[in-house]
Curated annotation (Swiss-Prot):
Gene: CFT1
Record lineage: Eukaryota, Fungi, Dikarya, Basidiomycota, Agaricomycotina
A GO BP entry: mRNA processing
A GO-annotated cellular component: mRNA cleavage and polyadenylation specificity factor complex
Region: Disordered, residue numbers: 721-759
Name under which the protein is recorded: Protein CFT1
Subcellular location: Nucleus
Organism for this UniProt entry: Cryptococcus neoformans var. neoformans serotype D (strain JEC21 / ATCC MYA-565) (Filobasidiella neoformans)
């Protein structure tokens, strides 16, 4: 059997973060400004933030903007009688302000937000991020990024053509340190020199991979022959730290220090190990050395400072600002400062310091009783450092100076709380980023409050002379610190959120269930994931698609094929305070068959029909500032008044071809007929008439396959002014072009000083901005100037030959020509008429069938800050979404016409399923697809695609574009506000026509929509009881650890006032409510001291009193943590959820009575019960090295039936029919069966390899079964039971077929089944869902042989032909190292992440790859669509 592994939910955990001042051009050049905001403050990009977790790399802009402060000056009940609300309507006919309205002045506050630029899933696990600048940075002014990966790899990346581009990849996986070193304890550390002269990566066996970076042109001359002179680096090499000093062993941390002429590195290492039982004789084993890399001499590493005798619990180093100097060493019990002369100053934060080290310290902060394991530190002022603990508590660390040295280190009380940190970095001036692997991350504002202190003059004796002060001046002089110390005292620092980056975090457990709101015949399973863990948990309720939440039926539109809710200005319309006049729907057009009905909308639920028009409606929109309606039918174009009456026939009926589609944007209209001819109309606002206008001044109008006229309100659509090389200075086009000119004076020349700057100066930024081509900002006409808040208007045409033309309105001048849209290129810009063919796509051959574009929509998509997108729907059902990104420089050296300053970058692509087979197209489908844009539905702006498989196309500012499917076909869609709700929309589905709304709790930031609930406790397990439809969770509470001896007597440990007591976990069982107020604890059960829940499942056991003889119970396996001096044990519990009978409302506030958790039995065990399950009505539970099957006798006690001795320690038990897979901690898994007469376990087969199994599951497909296991390293293995194979030892050994590296280690797995009928007891096909420690959800589905062979060939083509980010090989990433095999077993599981790259390739490249393997692109896309799983 074969399988496909793909990602359902990418990882959102953040392990590494990095701030880059100038990584993208938007940090140098000003952003486009919306026309409606010309008089407001600019939005400024202060820098870029790069975050990484697992295999996901994301790049953000940090945008600083001013937002109004909303103040409720008057309440509604305080408004005097007769006083009307003043509403600011959009500019229309009467755009002159009468001046009588009283307006309160707006107050603004400055905030910063994260704006996502790009996101990639790489073919490697990211282990570090570092910033650098190369020789090219002196030309374009941009920073570069270095990313390190698992298996000792470094990639140098830069920003080019609107995305990340790979400069080089450096691999060290074949060096001797990686082949023979100890990889188990290897922790890769990536560091770069502050002046970008060196990058190092730690390797096993105390070695460094060194990459010298070139910063001056003169450094290119001494390069060795054969090395590329264009490379921004010198040849890298591997340095053994023993060459520096033989005492350097066991590197704990290292970092480069700022302010040195040569690269200077600080090394923290421990030549000798110690442990807690050896502290009486050996302590203070760590050493700190500061050495210089002398690159000129090659092998010289001078020692500057050496300090020994540092605490043995040292954790990491923090570089100090130049004003403070030195290095901060963080230990688990205190903070140590080491200056450049080797002077040590320390402060302890708990009383364990004196038991661990003999180093003298300040005891002023010992009462804080902090634990610094897992903490993160960063300096925010020259003398103040923020210390963020593992639980998110923020403490300020103040360094007080005594002369020129640090005198006192003071750790202040907790100031605030942030998410549990995995990384902490400074994100510009006055901000830090707190990255978390357990959930949401913060972009936080640093609040610095200083107390005013009056400076007292100190009188000196005339005879008292300080010679140093006489020579160098008073070191306490306020002039040295810009009078800060004179006016202000010590700072009090706290953090507050600027922006929150949502994330799932580590997933502890998952469970499938049915929502209580699902009623009737249609029930959709939901996946509940428990994430978080260290402080509290988050309940994430995932659904595949956005749920249809119905408010009321709309029976008047039962047969509607298309609806238009229009905000027409009518006196009888109902006004709502929270809905702007421009969004208030007053007229409804419903196209039904060969007629169109016109309705007037009021606040009443039932609309009033006021007219009827002949023919179906293709398009309708408000016209002439919402005073009229323009309607397009297949035969005519008419102008209607605000009551739906015809006032002008714009395009009368004729014998010509029918109109097939149209686009309207007041005052422009364009129609396309069946023969692909187009007609353009322009409305006269004064005369209230619409007339035809020619598109081209000479010749015939172009023949087009798609047309669109649209309005841009974001300001992104701008144009470059024409320029000629002979009449103007050469313009540096280094940022966007591939061939960068050799400009030596890019930033004040390439001097050593400018090349080694870490950040651009304002003068350098101004010089780069002056090189920018002129961009059109003025309004092209008087009419657009008057209506500037409405935005600029543009006309887009896709000719029959596949060329996209964008023309500015109203002058109809071409500003963009490109074939990139028709060829599905990854990105495209204006070709400027210089390239006859598109660079990234191949020209179509003669006789080759064309995949035409049948609909093209330019619309904003986003939440809060919207982005302009281009949606293109092809004839085959292919949907491409392009984001319109601003450009700041042109690719060509000269251009004779205006050029659109926009780059269209593909951000999403998919194939919409069409019934009827592969050859069916959208044009002849049963229900064709149509793109319907919408605006502001619960704050979301995007598009909805009606058809056989409807989709929502939405996005948010900090997350990529998402496409969420619906389970039912949709015939019509439209946003409405006539009932007073902002989040309401009309939809006609198979169940009928409804007014629906988006739930306010719905989160659409992730790849799967979900509802999120923040819990007060941390939860480790969750399960669903199908009988009561309730969830049960196991909470983990941190309590002081209590040690017991073998007789059960309490043992006392070390005692002291400031000693931190040891803690452990104690579990409780909690029953959650359902319905309108879900996830409230309504009942529970507390376990004993030191007892933790190890496993929990919903089991179906025999129960004589139940209907059918079976009943659902909750089985819980626990274990006791008694410490290392006493043997552990466990218990098996059986609980049942019962509905209470009696008076309701007996609970406390907020409780939901009616259900309770009842304990049926408790069965003691000699070992922890790590796994429970059920089989044929019996309970399965592990007990250390044994497996038991038990029956529930009279619902009150467990009766043992059979047992099986297994290898070492069972971790998982999975059941299919009467077969079981028992996973072991060290010995892989067994394949076992159970017989009932007599009760007996039978071992069928075993896996003989030593693998630490985390999950083991059955994968079933049409009578065949295979076994899929995953281990702690994230490796997935597929094994078969094949007695006919000679190597299987007559079936006693399971045969290994495939090894596949899945990335992050799985924490839990669930198997779901696809049953063709409800009567099928056992599944003919299964799907495995995995949850990982990095917050990802992945899946494995089976693949038929013919489809697998085809997709395997596609994968081979993609490995060779697709461009992979960072230059990583996807095949090498998925290969598992196994020394027992002569060659890797890499075939058998397809890489879904790699296959998803197929849809992103240009059409020409797709056809070329498919021609080599004898298939077509539509067949491959259909295969991938069919393998999407059944959840």
């Amino acid at each position: 059997m074969h399988a496909l592994h793909q990602t359902l939910l990418p990882s959102s955990s953040i392990h590494h973060s990095l701030f880059l001042p100038h990584f993208t051009p938007s940090t140098i050049y000003p952003l486009p400004k919306p026309p409606a905001a010309l008089d407001t403050l600019d939005v400024k990009v202060i820098g870029n933030l790069v975050v990484a977790g697992a295999e996901v790399l994301r790049v953000f802009e940090i945008r600083e903007e001013s937002v109004p402060i909303i103040e409720n000056v008057k309440l509604e009940e305080d408004v005097a009688e007769g006083e009307k609300d003043v509403q600011m309507e959009e500019v229309g006919d009467g755009f002159f302000d009468d001046g009588h309205a009283e307006r309160a002045p707006l107050k603004y506050q400055t905030t910063r937000r994260l704006h996502l630029l790009t996101q990639h899933e790489l073919n490697g696990t990211i282990t570090g991020l570092a910033a650098t600048r190369t020789l090219e940075s002196t030309i374009d002014g941009l920073d570069r990024l270095i990313v390190s990966f698992k298996d000792a790899k470094m990639a140098l990346l830069e920003w080019s053509r609107g995305d990340i581009a790979t400069v080089s990849l450096h691999t060290y996986e074949r060096c001797s340190q990686m082949n023979t070193g100890d990889l188990q304890s290897y922790v890769p550390l990536l560091r770069t020199d502050p002046l970008s002269r060196l990058a190092v990566l730690t390797l096993p066996e105390d070695s460094l991979a060194v990459l010298p970076l070139i910063q001056e042109q003169s450094e290119l001359d001494p390069l060795s022959e054969g090395f590329s002179r264009d490379a921004p680096y010198s040849p890298s090499f591997v340095l053994s730290l023993s060459d520096m000093s033989i005492t350097i062993k066991n590197i704990q941390d290292l970092l480069f220090l700022p302010g040195f002429h040569s690269p200077t590195i600080a090394l923290l290492f421990s030549p000798m190990h110690t442990w807690s039982g050896r502290l009486q004789t050996v302590k203070d084993t760590f050493c700190l050395e500061i050495r210089t890399f002398d690159l000129s001499s090659g092998t010289s590493y001078p020692l500057l400072t050496s300090v020994s005798g540092l605490p043995s619990d040292s954790l990491y180093l923090v570089a100090c600002p130049s004003e403070l100097g030195g290095i901060v060493l963080v230990t688990s019990t205190g903070i140590v400062h080491v200056d450049q002369g080797g002077r040590v100053t320390a402060a302890c934060v708990n009383a364990w310091w004196s038991r661990i080290t003999s180093l003298k310290c300040s005891m002023a902060s010992v009462s804080q009783k902090l634990t610094l394991e897992g903490s993160r530190c960063v300096f925010v002022t020259p003398h103040d450092m923020l210390l963020v603990l593992q639980n998110g508590a923020v403490h300020q660390v103040r360094f007080s100076m005594e002369g020129r040295a640090v005198g006192v280190i003071e750790v202040l009380d907790k100031g605030c709380v942030v998410p549990p940190p995995s990384d902490l970095t400074v994100a510009g001036d006055g901000a830090v980023f707190v990255g978390s692997a357990e959930g949401d991350s913060w972009l936080a504002k640093v609040n610095v409050v200083r107390q005013v202190v009056e400076r007292s003059e100190k009188k000196k004796d005339e005879m008292e002379v300080d010679w140093d002060e006489d020579l160098y001046g008073d070191i306490n002089d306020a002039a040295l610190d810009e009078k800060a110390q004179e006016l202000f005292g010590p700072a009090a620092i706290t953090l507050s959120p600027y922006d929150i980056l949502t994330g799932v975090g580590k997933i502890m457990d998952i469970e499938f269930g049915i929502a209580a709101s699902d009623q009737g015949l249609r029930t959709y399973p939901q996946l509940v994931a428990v994430s978080g863990g260290s402080r509290n948990s988050t309940i994430n309720v995932f659904r595949r698609g956005i749920p249809i939440t119905k408010r009321r039926r709309f029976n008047e539109l039962l047969n509607a094929e298309g609806v238009w809710f229009l905000p027409i200005d009518r006196q009888t319309g109902q006004k709502f305070k929270d809905i702007p006049e421009a969004e208030r729907a007053t007229i409804l057009l419903s196209s039904e068959g060969n007629a169109t009905r016109v309705f007037a909308l009021f606040s009443k639920p039932t609309p009033q029909q006021i007219g009827r028009l002949d023919g179906k409606t293709l398009s309708a929109a408000p016209f002439f500032q919402r005073s009229c309606i323009l309607r397009v039918s297949p035969l005519e174009v008419v102008l209607l008044d605000n009551n739906g009456k015809i006032i002008q026939t714009v395009c009368p009926r004729g014998d010509g071809p029918k109109i097939v589609n149209a686009s309207i944007s007041d005052p422009f209209v364009i129609i396309r007929r069946a023969d692909d001819s187009v007609t353009f109309f322009v409305g006269d606002t004064v005369a209230r008439t619409v007339a035809e206008a020619p598109i081209v001044s000479e010749g015939e109008s172009p023949v087009c396959q798609a047309v669109e006229v649209f309005t841009d309100t974001t300001g992104v659509y701008r144009t470059f002014e024409p320029s000629k090389s002979e009449s103007s200075e050469p313009i540096s086009h280094q940022i966007d072009s591939e061939n960068k000119p050799n400009i030596t004076n890019g930033i004040n020349g390439t001097t050593a000083r400018s090349a080694r700057q870490t950040q651009l100066t304002p003068q350098q930024i101004k010089r780069l901005q002056e090189q920018e081509p002129a961009i059109t900002t003025e309004a092209p006409s008087m009419e657009t100037a008057i209506n500037s808040p409405h935005g600029t208007q543009w006309l887009a045409l896709v000719t029959r030959g596949g060329e996209l033309q964008i023309r500015s309105l109203p002058d109809l001048q071409i500003v963009l020509q490109s074939e990139g849209l028709a060829s599905s290129a990854p990105s495209f810009t204006d070709d400027l008429g210089e390239n006859p063919g598109y660079v990234l796509g191949e020209k179509r051959e003669e006789g080759e069938e064309e995949d035409e574009i049948i609909q093209m929509v330019f619309c904003p998509i986003g939440k809060g800050t919207v982005r302009q997108h281009l949606l293109a729907l092809h004839h085959s059902g292919r949907l491409n979404a392009y984001e319109a990104q601003p450009r700041f420089t042109v690719d060509a050296s000269s251009h004779s016409r205006r050029s659109l300053a926009v780059r269209f970058r593909k951000v999403h692509t998919q194939l919409l399923p069409i019934s009827g087979g592969v050859g069916t197209t959208n044009g002849n489908a049963r229900l064709p697809y149509t793109i319907v844009p919408f605006n502001n539905i619960e704050g979301l702006t995007g598009a909805f695609i009606t058809g056989e498989k409807p989709h929502w196309i939405i996005s948010s500012e900090a997350h990529p574009l998402r496409a969420f499917a619906l389970k039912q076909a949709a015939m019509a869609f439209g946003k409405t506000t006539h009932l007073g709700g902002k989040g309401e929309y009309f939809i006609r589905i198979e169940d009928g026509s409804f007014i629906c709304y988006l739930p306010p709790t719905l989160n659409t930031d992730f790849a799967i929509p979900c509802d999120r609930y923040q819990m007060e406790r941390a939860y480790t397990n969750i399960t669903f009881d199908p009988t009561s439809a309730h969830y049960v969770g196991a909470a983990s509470i941190e309590v002081p650890f209590q040690a017991y001896d073998e007789e059960g007597e309490i043992q006392l440990g070390p005692d002291g006032p400031d000693l931190i007591p040891p803690t452990n976990q104690r579990s409780t069982l909690e029953l959650f409510s359902q319905g309108s107020d879900p996830w409230k604890v309504i009942d529970g059960y507390e376990f004993d001291q030191n007892e933790e829940v190890m496993s929990m499942e919903s089991v179906n056991l025999e129960s004589p009193g139940a209907p059918g003889g079976y009943r659902d119970f909750i089985a819980v396996g626990t274990g006791f943590n008694f410490g290392e001096d006493r043997a552990t044990r466990g218990n098996t519990y059986i609980f049942e959820i019962l509905q209470t009978v009696g008076p309701q409302g007996g609970g406390g506030p907020g409780s939901v009575p009616g259900w309770k958790l009842v304990k049926r039995t408790k069965d003691p065990a000699r070992h922890p019960v790590n796994a429970v399950n059920h089989i044929n009505g019996y309970l399965l539970n592990t007990n250390g090295p044994k497996l038991y099957v038990k029956g529930l006798d009279y619902d009150s006690q467990l009766m043992g039936l059979a047992f099986l001795d297994i290898q070492l320690y069972a971790t998982t038990v999975k059941v299919f029919k009467n077969f079981m897979l028992i996973g072991d901690l060290c010995k892989s898994f067994w394949f076992v069966s159970l017989q009932e007469d007599p009760y007996k376990f039978t071992t069928i087969s075993k896996d003989l390899q030593h693998v630490s199994v985390v999950t083991a599951d059955f994968l079933v497909h049409d009578g065949q079964v295979t076994f899929i296991s995953s281990d702690r390293n994230g490796d997935m293995r597929m094994l078969d039971f094949d007695p006919t194979d000679p190597d299987s030892l007559n079936g006693e050994r399971l045969m290994l077929r495939t090894e596949y590296h899945a990335g992050s280690a799985a924490t839990v797995s669930k198997v779901i089944a696809r049953r063709k009928t409800a009567e099928e007891e056992f599944a003919p096909q299964t799907q495995i869902i995995y949850a990982t420690a990095d917050g990802a959800l992945t899946t494995v589905v089976s693949v038929k042989d013919a489809r697998f062979k085809r997709l395997q060939l596609v994968s081979d083509q993609l490995v060779r032909n697709a461009q992979h980010v960072a230059g990583l090989n996807p095949r090498a990433f998925r290969t598992v190292r196994n020394d027992l095999l002569p060659r890797p077993l890499s075939k058998g599981i397809l890489d879904g992440q790699l296959l998803n790259q197929f849809a992103l390739q240009p059409i020409g490249r797709q056809k070329e790859m498919m021609r080599q393997i004898g298939t077509d692109a539509v067949t491959v896309a259909s295969d991938l669509q069919a393998l999407g799983g059944f959840w």
